[in-house]
Swiss-Prot record:
Name this polypeptide is given: Elongation factor Ts
Signal peptide boundaries: none
InterPro entries: EF-Ts_dimer_sf, Transl_elong_EFTs/EF1B, Transl_elong_EFTs/EF1B_dimer, Transl_elong_Ts_CS, UBA-like_sf
One example GO MF annotation: translation elongation factor activity
Task of the protein: Associates with the EF-Tu.GDP complex and induces the exchange of GDP to GTP. It remains bound to the aminoacyl-tRNA.EF-Tu.GTP complex up to the GTP hydrolysis stage on the ribosome.
Gene name of the record: tsf
Entry superkingdom: Bacteria
Lineage summary: Bacteria, Pseudomonadati, Pseudomonadota, Alphaproteobacteria, Rickettsiales
Family matches, as SUPFAM superfamilies: Elongation factor Ts (EF-Ts), dimerisation domain, UBA-like
Main location: cytoplasm
Family per similarity comment: Belongs to the EF-Ts family.
Compartment annotation: Cytoplasm
Length: 287
């Protein structure tokens, strides 16, 4: 058996030497046929791991001026999350998600993956090669038609980490300066983890529940209706500062809110700026 063929087959499939040698022997040295056989072996090995829990992993970002993607690929241990093959796989998936403008997990799973077939097949092959269950769990896609998309991944190594954020800024101002503003906001989002962009975007049921809890707490103070209302409104304002992005104190300067920072940024970009949307991915979070 030609050793060069065995090495080539291993490089192309990522599987072990013994599997590659056996496949070539069974396929009379035909590399193309052996690849098909090894892919079947890889999928079979992956199926055996389907019930295992993949709770570690990484967040990957792929960013361009007007479009950004965040994906979460899970594995079972931090050891595999730091493996070069895992890093290469998730980086490729983020790139494919961006190139194909994937707005859902299913669309990305069915996208083509060069030399393998589909993204889903590449993930299952990765499960076989790395020996742990791999799972593509979440994807965030954000596009800005009249402005920029900026982003930040915490622990950023080649756009990879455990938490990532994208923000959309609507403006006709200087694009490079908008990117700087957007990255600062994305860093804030990663640190403070807001639940909604504005008060209008906050889940109404959650907001009503919070107000009901506060009203119940204030009842025991035996204050007049007018004073009670002021106390409730004040505590709701504090609540908004905790969960609403535009109401939060800016992490780099707590003397102003994010909404104030947005207004100040308009002078540097020479145009009005609107923070129109954001996305946040935290590894392992269900949100």
């Amino acid at each position: 058996m030609n050793p060069d063929n065995i090495r080539e087959l291993r490089d192309r499939t990522g599987l072990g030497l013994s599997d590659c040698k056996k496949a070539l022997e069974e396929c009379s040295g035909d590399i193309k046929e052996a690849i098909g056989k090894l892919r079947a072996i890889g999928l079979a090995k992956a199926d055996k791991k389907i019930d295992r829990v993949a709770s570690d992993g990484l967040i990957a970002m792929h960013l361009a001026e007007s479009c950004g993607v965040l994906i979460e690929l899970n594995c079972e241990t931090d050891f595999v999350a730091r493996n070069e093959k895992f890093i290469e796989l998730i980086s490729n998936l983020a790139s494919i998600a961006y190139q194909e403008r994937c707005t859902s997990i299913d669309k990305l799973k069915n996208a083509k993956y060069e030399g393998v077939g589909t993204v889903q097949e590449a993930i299952m092959n990765g499960t076989s090669v790395l020996g742990e269950k791999l799972e593509l769990s979440r994807l965030c896609y954000l596009e800005a038609k009249d402005g920029v998309i900026a982003g930040y991944v915490h622990g950023d190594v080649r756009g990879l980490g455990k938490t990532g954020a994208l923000v959309a800024l609507r403006s006709s101002g200087d694009k490079s300066k908008l990117q700087e503003v957007g990255k600062q906001i994305a860093m804030h989002v990663v640190a403070m983890k807001p639940e909604a962009l504005s008060i209008d975007n906050l889940d109404q049921t959650k907001m009503n529940n919070e107000r009901s809890i506060i009203e119940e707490q204030v009842k025991g103070l035996n204050k007049s209706e007018e004073v009670t209302k002021k106390i409730v409104d004040g505590r709701m304002a504090k609540y908004y500062e905790e969960v609403i992005l535009l109401e939060q104190k800016f992490i780099k300067d707590d003397k102003m809110k994010i909404s104030d920072f947005m207004r100040l940024s308009e002078s540097s970009v020479n145009s009005p700026v609107e923070l129109s949307d954001y996305k946040l991915l935290v590894l392992g979070s269900k949100n």
